[in-house]
From Swiss-Prot:
Keyword Cell membrane listed: yes
GO cellular-component term (any): plasma membrane
PANTHER family: SODIUM/NUCLEOSIDE COTRANSPORTER (PTHR10590), SOLUTE CARRIER FAMILY 28 MEMBER 3 (PTHR10590:SF4)
GO MF annotation: an example: nucleoside transmembrane transporter activity
One of the GO biological process terms: nucleoside transmembrane transport
Localization per Swiss-Prot or TrEMBL: Cell inner membrane
Name of the gene encoding the protein in the UniProt record: nupC
Keyword Transmembrane in record: yes
Membrane-spanning segments: 2-22, 34-54, 93-113, 174-194, 198-218, 264-284, 292-314, 354-374, 395-415
Lineage of the species this protein comes from: Bacteria, Pseudomonadati, Campylobacterota, Epsilonproteobacteria, Campylobacterales
Protein known as: Nucleoside permease NupC
Amino acid sequence: MIFSSLFSVVGMAVLFLIAWVFSSNKRAINYRTIVSAFVIQVALGALALYVPLGREMLQGLASGIQSVISYGYEGVRFLFGNLAPNAKGDQGIGGFVFAINVLAIIIFFASLISLLYYLKIMPLFINLIGGALQKCLGTSRAESMSAAANIFVAHTEAPLVIKPYLKSMSDSEIFAVMCVGMASVAGPVLAGYASMGIPLPYLIAASFMSAPGGLLFAKIIYPQNETISSHADVSIEKHVNAIEAIANGASTGLNLALHVGAMLLAFVGMLALINGLLGVVGGFLGMEHLSLGLILGTLLKPLAFMLGIPWSQAGIAGEIIGIKIALNEFVGYMQLLPYLGDNPPLILSEKTKAIITFALCGFANLSSVAMLIGGLGSLVPKKKDLIVRLALKAVLVGTLSNFMSATIAGLFIGLNAH
C-alpha cells in the first residue's frame, strides 16, 4: 500500500514537471494559484472517494441523477417502443443500441439543463462555484465562471456564459477558458457515458475535479502577466417561458447527439480500417495481431504505470487512453466497456478501472481541436489566431488535468481498499 501511494505521488510530480517544462513564462507562475488549485482538486478527490460521508453523498447524487436519466427513458420508449430500455434500466428487445440508449438521453438531458437555466437554478450554482474558485485561486471572475460552467455544459457552450467579457479578457484568461473546456465534459454527455454503463460516481467526481485541475495546469503553462478582468456575472440566453427553454434545449441536444453519432460512425469505422491495414502489414512482418491499440498500448504503458496502474494491466490502460487522445473519449469508453462486464478479456482491479475512467473523462483529444477553434473563435474573432496557436497546448492541459484527477483517484481508492 505504501509503495502504491508513493508511486501515485511520484506520478503527480511528473505531471507537474511536464507542465513546468512547457510553461511559456516560468517566472510569472503564481504559485498561490497553483497550490490552491491542487489542494482543491485533492480535497474533492478525498471527499468523493475516501471520506465515508463524502462517498455516501456522492452515491446519493449519482442515484438521483440515474433516476433522472431513467425518466428520460420514458420519452425514448415512447419513440422507439420495446427497442428502448424501460424506466428500470432493463434493455429493450434489441439489446444495447447506442443511438437509442445513449444519444437519445443526451437530448433529454440537454433539455433538462436548458430548463434549469431558465429557472435560474444553473446560474446560481455557476455563480457559487465560480465565485468560490475566484476567491480561493485568485483567478479572474470570468475564467472562474467559465470553469464552473464547464462542469455542466460543453466546451463550445460554456464561453457563452461569459460572452460579454471575452473581448476584454487577457490571452492567459482566454487560454484558461480553452483549457477548462478540454479538461471537462458536458452534463448531457456525462449522462451519455452513464447510459453506456460507465460508473456514474466516478464521472461526477471527475467532472467537479476538472474545474480546479484545468485552471491549475493552464496557469502553469500560460501564466497571467496582464491585467485581468475583474467583473463578470453569468450571461444566459433569455427564454420566453419554460416551454421554449425545453424546446431549445432539445434542439441543442439533438445537434450534440448528431455530432456525437457522426463522429463515432466515422472514428469507429476509421479505427477498424486502420487496424485492418495494420493487420495486413503485420501479416507480412510475422505480427498477426498488430493493431493501433497494440501500438498505443506499448507506447503508453509506462504512462499508465506512472498514473498508478499495475504493470500487468498498464498495457490495456495505455491502449484505451491512447485511443481516447487520438480519437475521442466515447471511443475510449467503448474500449473500456468489455472490462467492466461479467466476462472481461482481462480482470482489472477496481483501482485500475477508476484511474482509466477518470483519465478518459474530458474533451481533451485531437478531434476536439476543430470544435474549440470554430466555437470560441466565432465568439471572439480578434483572438482567433491566439486560439489556433494555443489549441494543442489546451489539449495538453486538459490531458494533464484528467491524468491528475486519475492519479488522485487511484491514490484514495488504493488507500480506501486497505
